[in-house]
Design a protein with these regions (language model features):
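A conserved regulatory-domain signal marking ACT and ACT-like small-molecule sensing domains
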Residues: 1-122
Length: 122
């Protein structure tokens, strides 16, 4: 299945991430999962949240550089090796993973990922 992910571009300076989190808190938007990928000058803070459209509008309205996109969400049994099994299938099908992160939800492992071939991934 796919879910909407918010990508927030934040400067690598103290307080920038706090501003984003405070805006989401004030809007009563719950974070479900998040990850940060950084470069020298900025980071990309990716989140899965309770209300992605409202989160996008809230952050955009505050002048924050933000994007919304569909990513894949795969629910797995929370046992060793399940992520490897899932990635193996994608690899065998010639599908490359652009990025991936995971979290636990109600005792299940959830993989969030983007691929180089969304149509084939479906």
């Amino acid at each position: 299945m796919t879910v909407q992910q918010i990508s927030i571009f934040v400067e690598n300076k103290q307080g920038t991430l706090l501003k984003v989190l405070e805006l989401l808190k004030e809007a009563n938007i719950q974070l479900v999962a998040s990850t940060i990928a950084d470069t020298v000058e900025y980071g990309i803070y990716r989140i899965i949240c309770s209300e992605p459209q409202r989160a996008f509008a809230t952050l955009k309205g505050a002048g924050i550089s933000v994007a919304i996109s569909d990513v894949f969400a795969l629910t797995l049994d929370n046992v060793p090796g399940r992520a490897a099994d899932a990635v193996r299938i994608l690899t065998q099908e010639g599908i490359g993973i652009t990025y991936m992160y995971s979290f636990l939800y109600e005792g299940k492992g959830i993989l969030i990922f983007r691929t180089d071939n969304p149509d084939k991934t479906r």
